[in-house]
């Protein structure tokens, strides 16, 4: 299909004068908020887990290459779409091409699903903060603690509701006074905390019952050294797909969040520079998370301990903190506070995206819209939290795993819908409106877009193919 630059918004009239009245005050506010959305719980447990599983430095190298090519392309697309149209995902895609309005609806459904369970995870983290605040760190290290907590109807729902209300309060206060102000405070504090814990992790040393001494620096070497043992073409493709799926978890792309945040930025903000800053911040936090977690796990539990998946944060790390000297309680508290900051800024961005779309569709004001959505998602969070007790079910997922309600929502939104949306978005930009539709917005006001050649190639040829493969793999149709 030939490129077509004659669609309604392609000429620029749709977006040049549609900037929203209430938005970020400037580039710093936007970058902090966008980075806050990107830096989530996935950076803290999933990235270190995949690095340990997929060859350490080999995974890191592949991830970095994909972030600054593949991730850069998707992030540029979402932010430019938002600013050029001045609209949220549902109406933004309609402005690009009326025949593709269905893509906006699909994109909107992703945060709608994610919001049902994100406050539940935030509630889990909040529970651990309370445990460490009250000096019960040895209790948190017990094998049954996490399971006992999530299967307790009263405890799991209470903390989910608390986290949901905190998220809603920030969104209720708007973009500038709520989201931007929150991000400007939480993100720098979180960065300082993760750097401090990472440095502390490198100083750790422990001798086990067998007399083997392991150090944090040895754990760092395990983390950063590329491991090519047993590497085959099939294994390399698995690592590649793992790295690409992590980018979805990490950069908040293909879920409408960056379109919404893009619609809030002013025309004098340099999109290209902002994107590089977001990528550096997000990737830096992921790398530091690995530097913090892998050496800590390695010192006290060895290589075997690093194979834990989602349980790493809530089961493995509390054991590590309990094994530390007197500082274990305080390190554990600092870690979970940092994790709460990451979860909160991400959860806020998800709820804000839903709120902004609803305000635009139904022509309602922020406060009543936020209150209504808070009621809806408080109920949804309670239902999902009870998925481990009152509403417990076992669901076979296409990837071969068995999950509960939370896992089902996560699979549909992250593993199934997001690759599909990215593929369709790339086709729309690359072959319907044309890459220059995006390039023009990035270069607006005489700004330089040095990587526009790379962007054109990625959005037209590489992203659609990779996303199609990832979609087939996630759907269980293609087994790599």
Tell where the protein language model's regions lie, with residue ranges.
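C-terminal membrane-solvent junction of multi-pass transporters and transport-like membrane proteins
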Residues: 103, 355, 362-374, 410-467
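Inter-helical loop and helix-membrane interface segments of multi-pass membrane transporters/permeases
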Residues: 18-21, 50-54, 87-106, 119-178, ...
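Loop-to-transmembrane helix boundary motifs in multi-pass membrane proteins
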Residues: 29, 153-158, 281-287, 329-332, ...
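Membrane-interface "cap" regions at the ends of multi-pass membrane proteins
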Residues: 1-45, 74-79, 83-95, 101-102, ...
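Helix-loop-helix connectors at the membrane interface of multi-pass transporters/channels
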Residues: 2-4, 122-151, 262-268, 273, ...
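Membrane-water interface regions at transmembrane-helix termini and the short interhelical loops
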Residues: 50-54, 80, 95-96, 102-115, ...
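Membrane-embedded translocation segments of transport machinery
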Residues: 12, 17-24, 184-344, 348, ...
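Transmembrane helix-boundary motif of multi-pass solute transporters/channels
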Residues: 26-66, 256-257, 273-276, 280-283
């Amino acid at each position: 299909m030939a490129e077509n630059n004659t669609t309604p918004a392609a000429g620029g009239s749709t977006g040049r004068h549609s900037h929203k009245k209430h938005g970020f005050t400037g580039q710093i506010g936007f970058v902090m908020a966008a980075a806050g959305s990107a830096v989530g719980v996935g950076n803290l447990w999933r990235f270190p887990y995949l690095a340990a599983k997929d060859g350490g430095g080999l995974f890191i190298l592949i991830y970095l290459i994909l972030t600054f090519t593949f991730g850069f392309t998707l992030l540029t697309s979402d932010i430019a779409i938002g600013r050029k149209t001045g609209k949220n995902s549902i109406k933004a895609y309609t402005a690009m091409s009326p025949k593709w309005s269905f893509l906006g609806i699909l994109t909107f459904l992703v945060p709608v699903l994610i919001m049902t369970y994100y406050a539940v995870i935030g509630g889990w983290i909040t529970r651990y903060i309370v445990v460490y605040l009250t000096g019960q760190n040895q209790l948190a290290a017990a094998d049954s603690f996490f399971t006992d907590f999530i299967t307790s109807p009263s405890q799991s729902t209470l903390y989910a509701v608390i986290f949901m209300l905190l998220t809603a309060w920030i969104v209720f206060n708007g973009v500038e006074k709520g989201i931007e102000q929150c991000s400007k405070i939480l993100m720098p504090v979180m960065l300082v905390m993760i750097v401090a814990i990472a440095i502390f992790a490198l100083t750790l040393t422990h001798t086990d019952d067998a007399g083997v001494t392991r150090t944090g620096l040895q754990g760092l070497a395990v983390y950063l050294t590329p491991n090519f043992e047993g590497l085959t073409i099939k294994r390399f493709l698995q690592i590649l797909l793992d790295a690409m799926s992590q980018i979805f978890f990490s950069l908040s792309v293909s879920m409408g969040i960056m379109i919404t945040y893009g619609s809030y930025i002013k025309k004098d903000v340099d999109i290209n520079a902002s994107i590089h800053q977001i990528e550096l911040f997000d990737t830096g936090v992921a790398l530091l998370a690995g530097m913090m977690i892998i050496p800590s796990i390695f010192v006290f539990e060895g290589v075997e301990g690093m194979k834990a998946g989602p349980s790493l944060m809530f089961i493995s790390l509390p054991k590590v903190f309990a094994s530390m000297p007197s500082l274990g309680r305080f390190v554990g508290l600092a870690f979970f506070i940092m994790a709460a900051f990451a979860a909160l800024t991400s959860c806020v961005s998800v709820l804000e995206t839903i709120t902004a779309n609803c305000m635009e569709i139904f022509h309602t004001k922020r406060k009543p819209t936020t209150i209504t959505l808070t009621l809806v998602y408080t109920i949804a969070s309670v239902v999902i939290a009870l998925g481990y007790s009152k509403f417990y079910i076992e669901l076979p997922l296409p990837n071969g795993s068995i999950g509960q309600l939370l896992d089902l929502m996560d699979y549909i939104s992250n593993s199934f819908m997001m690759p599909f949306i990215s593929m369709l978005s790339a086709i729309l930009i690359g072959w319907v409106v044309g890459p220059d539709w995006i390039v023009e917005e990035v270069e607006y006001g005489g700004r330089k877009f040095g990587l526009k050649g790379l962007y054109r190639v990625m959005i037209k040829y590489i992203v659609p193919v990779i996303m199609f493969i990832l979609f087939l793999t996630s759907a269980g149709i293609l087994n790599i």
